[in-house]
């Protein structure tokens, strides 16, 4: 039995489905802010509007979509409008004009009660400042969202315990915020957000105040949690390395406008203007880009219970010289060349794949950097298999693709 190629990005059933749709969004601060949108003033610059009318443009005609199950990163310098944008999405800051649709709900058209129900039932936010209540222990802080929903104590504690376990705080339930490190306090904030089982998770520079090592650990936790829960996430940051590591797509903002939207490799390798290029000009691409950014579908994947004749036919049909062998759960078993397939008898593909993989590259995780990947890829004639944390095949990296990426980087 042969298998269809596996998409290397995300696990959403409908990866192109727009969960959030933002169109022509404006936020202007000041008296009678709609003046900035008139035909007379639309072409005037931000500085001119501020000096002549006393209006400050926070967001200027912003449009984008966020797909269901996607981690969408909004990145920019201080004052670029990224934090204003994330607050406008749920009208914590009231937009001046534009349209915001979240999973079919018209946010701009919602009345006070509808907006409150939407925020309380479908969205959670995590800020850079943890916002923990000092007189409440970890359990009561993390279960706060469920408590204000009126969830009974036993039920909310059980749900919250699952999230505390997920973020690595098992055993700290009775501790108070003053007894926790910054990283642990932020884990409480993340558990509090996840406990309400939100459809949409808004994270506004949640790791910016943490030490570099703790920050990386928290990024690892978020990646792991997203693999399990597959939430729709809007993540705000000013750090390119963080944006590339976490984001399925990245929007770079400048002066309240979106300068470029693209996948991480597009932002790093193909900036659309000088402003975006400035973010990446001093970056060692191979230290930021990871396997998931360059991996492709394996041209030939066969099941370990396939008959050799069928496996050989699949390899030849794909125009390949080897096949990636997986079991019924798509767990990676090994690599088989055409010669090894010909030598295998019925029921022997798995054993031959395991032996044949001794000379093939070891499987790597999607978040391994190209810097770490290069020596592995160069040491073998075979492509490097990329597997998730359950050992399931996600894609491959061949030397040609890797070389092309590096040459573009240089």
Where are the regions a protein language model picked out?
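Conserved ABC ATPase "signature" region
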Residues: 37-48, 105-106, 143, 147, ...
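Conserved ABC transporter NBD signature motif
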Residues: 98-106
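Conserved ABC ATPase signature
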Residues: 176-180, 184
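A short, proline-enriched helix->beta-strand linker immediately N-terminal to the Walker B motif
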Residues: 195-199
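ABC ATPase "signature
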Residues: 261-262, 270, 335, 396
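The conserved cystathionine-beta-synthase
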Residues: 301-321, 325-329, 342-345, 362-410
């Amino acid at each position: 039995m042969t298998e269809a190629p596996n998409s290397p990005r995300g696990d959403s059933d409908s990866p192109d489905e727009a969960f959030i749709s933002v169109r022509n969004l404006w936020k202007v601060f000041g008296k009678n802010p709609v003046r900035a949108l008139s035909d007379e003033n639309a072409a005037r610059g931000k500085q001119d509007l501020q000096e002549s009318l006393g209006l400050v443009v926070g967001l200027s005609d912003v449009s984008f979509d966020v797909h269901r199950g996607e981690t969408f990163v909004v990145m920019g310098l201080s004052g670029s409008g990224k934090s204003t944008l994330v607050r406008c999405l749920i009208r914590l800051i009231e937009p001046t004009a534009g349209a915001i649709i979240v999973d079919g709900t018209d946010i701009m058209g919602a009345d006070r009660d509808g907006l409150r129900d939407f925020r309380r039932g479908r969205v959670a936010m995590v800020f850079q400042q943890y916002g923990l209540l000092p007189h409440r222990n970890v359990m009561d802080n993390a279960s706060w969202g469920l408590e204000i929903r009126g969830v009974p104590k036993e039920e909310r504690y059980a749900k919250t315990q699952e999230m505390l376990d997920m973020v690595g705080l098992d055993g700290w339930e009775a501790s108070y915020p003053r007894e926790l490190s910054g990283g642990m306090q932020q884990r409480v904030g993340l558990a509090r957000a996840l406990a309400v089982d939100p459809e949409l998770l808004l994270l506004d520079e949640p790791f910016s105040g943490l030490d570099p090592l703790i920050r990386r650990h928290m990024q690892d936790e978020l990646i792991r949690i997203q693999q399990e829960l597959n939430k729709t996430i809007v993540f705000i940051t000013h750090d390119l390395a963080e944006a590339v590591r976490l984001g399925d797509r990245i929007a770079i903002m400048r002066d309240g406008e979106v300068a470029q939207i693209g996948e991480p490799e597009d932002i790093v390798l193909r900036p659309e203007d000088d402003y975006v290029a400035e973010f990446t000009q001093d970056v060692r691409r191979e230290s930021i880009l990871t396997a998931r950014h360059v991996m492709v579908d394996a041209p030939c994947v066969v099941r370990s219970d396939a008959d050799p004749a069928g496996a050989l036919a699949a390899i030849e049909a794909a125009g390949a010289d080897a096949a990636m062998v997986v079991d019924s759960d798509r767990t990676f078993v090994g690599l088989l060349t055409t010669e090894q397939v010909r030598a295998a008898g019925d029921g022997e593909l798995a054993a031959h794949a395991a032996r044949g993989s001794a000379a093939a590259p070891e499987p790597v995780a999607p978040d391994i950097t190209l810097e770490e990947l290069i020596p592995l890829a160069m040491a073998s004639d075979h492509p490097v298999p990329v597997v998730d944390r359950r050992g399931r095949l996600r894609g491959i990296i061949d030397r040609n693709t890797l070389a092309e990426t590096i040459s573009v980087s240089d």
